[in-house]
């Protein structure tokens, strides 16, 4: 599992895992082969993390998303590993090609749930799925990208209060804290 996570940074994989952690991974593969194997390992790794490594729901939760770039924008047309799955998306840092990692964490920083979607999926979309917010109640804090009246009402019915900062052009709304 460590080599797969470390593959997100090629320099770390080549310098740390292949050289200094070789005794822990005697059959370590080349970086190019590891990138090819990522697609096969993605689903089992996701299931393992969901079953074993998630934290406990304590009270206040935070939701956010981050891009997982699979290649540079100039190489989209020759990319093969996630062809047909990865999509072009936009984040605060500009355009990217890949996936979005949506995370819900508690105040201790423990991951409570996560979802990986194609890059073109709206940040609010995973919160609409019952499986993403199941076993949660209380307050959920998000950034301005999660503002949606329909989403707020849907989560409120499920016992989740979505808290976001208001945009500059919005009228103030009363919320109980």
What are these regions (language model features)?
Residues 1-177:
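Short alpha-helical elements
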